[in-house]
Amino acid sequence: MHQFTKDYYEDGVRKHISGYEDYKWMPTRSIPEALDIQNHFEFKTCVDYGCAKGFLVNALRIIGCDAWGEDISEYAVQNCHPNVRDYVSLPNDKFYDLLICKDVLEHVEVEDIPSVLKNFKKKSNQFFFVIPLGDNDRFRIREYEVDVTHVTKKDEEWWIKMFESQGMELVKFSYSLGSIKEKWIKPHPHGNGFFILRTSEC
């Protein structure tokens, strides 16, 4: 099984295991994304779950948000942006107003998704998921097939049913949100799903 190691983030293209190559901070991408999140959601605290090196966390903090990051990759956490070393960690039990999960759930095996979502409900009651969409176990955006850890390739209806089965209420679904993943939207307008959800108990 491939893990999220140094090779995954720094040499993934050459080694044919991911789309990453010398994964670095790009403020021209991360700060507009952070502003879009700030403008679309009401929250005091937020967590980027699956934050990798914490670039979105850094951007959110730059614009004044109380943002945190969690990731299962020890390499990513240990090599996070220096500005957020005190704010990025391995998964923990903290609770936040908003849980952001961008390009993460496709890495989770189908049978494990319910337990992951149950864990998310312990961490927040408001969720923003960005997920590459697929049909017949193929991503609509073929470039996403490069990543060997991309194992779940489902369409928007499948995801909505999954979320609802775990007690999450769909607030809004769309194929875009501001500048987030904008380079993919023009060539692939239905390639990514943007899901805004809350717990049914809210």
Please give the residue ranges for each predicted region.
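Conserved helix-to-beta-strand junction in the class I
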Residues: N119-K123
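Conserved beta-strand signature within the Rossmann-like core of class I S-adenosyl-L-methionine
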Residues: S124-G134
